[in-house]
Amino acid sequence: IVTRFIEKPAPSEVFSDLANTGIYIFEPEILSMIPDYMPYDFSNDLFPRLLNEGIRIFTTEASGYWSDIGDIEQYAATQADMLDGKCAFETTAKSDGQGIFIEESARIGKRAVITAPCYIGANAEIADNAYFGGYSVACSGVRIGKNSSVKRCILLPEVRVREGAELRGAVLCERVQVEDGASIFEKAAIGAESVLE
């Protein structure tokens, strides 16, 4: 039973090593307490109200990996944890046992350089003389052109990285196109279908 609740406490306010992961089951009468047509946050509004009114909140403690991926840095860190084997993930990719995961339908140029840890998705292509790896993820259908270099990046489906491009520490959403010789650096997050020259 929850007796106290603080959403995202400062280090000096922490009183437990448990976290609210945002998975809830409510009785219908609890949902009726939520006002219509106005912002109302479970953690900041509903839970304090329930505790103040003496309504019991029950919990269950789950084991395993959990990460709050509310910003780009934490999203990238969680991807890195997956590549490092700190949390399980399902894949049909073949592993070399050293941290390189490649889906069977991916195509890798003979002179491409692939370094661990990384994941190369279904139907992805990495051209000759391209570098890919060092905590990078290429989702399905990604194309990386000749003489391009991709390190510490997450490339969502159908991203196109043209010849001679350089990417470092970025997240590229679906169908982004990076033109010849373009550069993208640390902490960049590029929206879906953007074109970078």
PLM region spans:
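Catalytic-core segments of class I nucleotidyltransferases/pyrophosphorylases
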Residues: 1-90
